[in-house]
């Protein structure tokens, strides 16, 4: 046992199965990982993961890290320029754990206790990798950002929606900026936002 977290959270196992389990179709997690290494890290379409020794991974991935990494918690310049940031993540995201976004927010907050003045994190229940899944995955992020940037109205309670293929809304759920969360009242349909209350974590 190495005490290393391999699969960090419960939830979304069914909807995320194609990212983590073999199937008759090409596993997207495998294709994404191997393709990323071939074309972004090593610039070698013949790169073979089965012969790679991971002891040099930090050195090998340094170049791609310089233009893809988004993990610097020092947002002082961003704040000074009056920047505003909304980060959202699906709780059922298979390839990228939402706990990474939570950890990032906490790191920023350690540097700046006033982080919520310019940075809000929303976690969408049942939503997989950027959209889809059992949960409501549609939020009007653009209007939310416009209200914050142009009218000085920071986002608070938002409504996420799930629609069917005909565009009909089949589920709504309130969202609150982390660490606040919506909790089912215990009565009424779980597909209705009105049946959820705000709870502090």
How does the language model describe each region?
Residues 1-201:
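C-terminal His-loop and adjacent cap/lid subdomain of alpha/beta-hydrolase
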């Amino acid at each position: 046992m190495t005490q290393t977290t391999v699969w960090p959270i419960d939830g979304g196992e069914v909807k995320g199965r194609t990212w983590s389990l073999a199937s008759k179709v090409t596993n997207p997690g495998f294709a994404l990982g191997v393709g990323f290494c071939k074309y972004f890290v090593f610039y070698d379409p013949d790169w073979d993961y089965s012969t790679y020794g991971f002891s040099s991974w930090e050195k090998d991935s340094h170049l791609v890290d310089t233009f893809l990494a988004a993990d610097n918690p020092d947002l002082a310049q961003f704040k000074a320029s009056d920047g505003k940031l909304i980060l959202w993540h699906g709780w059922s995201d298979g390839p990228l754990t939402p706990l990474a976004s939570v950890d990032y927010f906490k790191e920023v907050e350690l540097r700046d206790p006033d982080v919520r003045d310019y940075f809000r994190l929303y976690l969408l229940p049942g939503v997989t990798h950027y959209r889809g899944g059992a949960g409501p995955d549609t939020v009007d992020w653009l209007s939310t950002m416009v209200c914050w940037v142009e009218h000085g109205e920071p986002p608070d309670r938002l409504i996420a929606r799930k629609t069917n293929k005909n565009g009909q809304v089949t589920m709504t759920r309130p969202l609150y900026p982390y660490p606040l969360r919506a909790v089912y009242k215990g009565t009424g349909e779980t597909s209705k936002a009105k049946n959820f209350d705000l709870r502090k974590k």
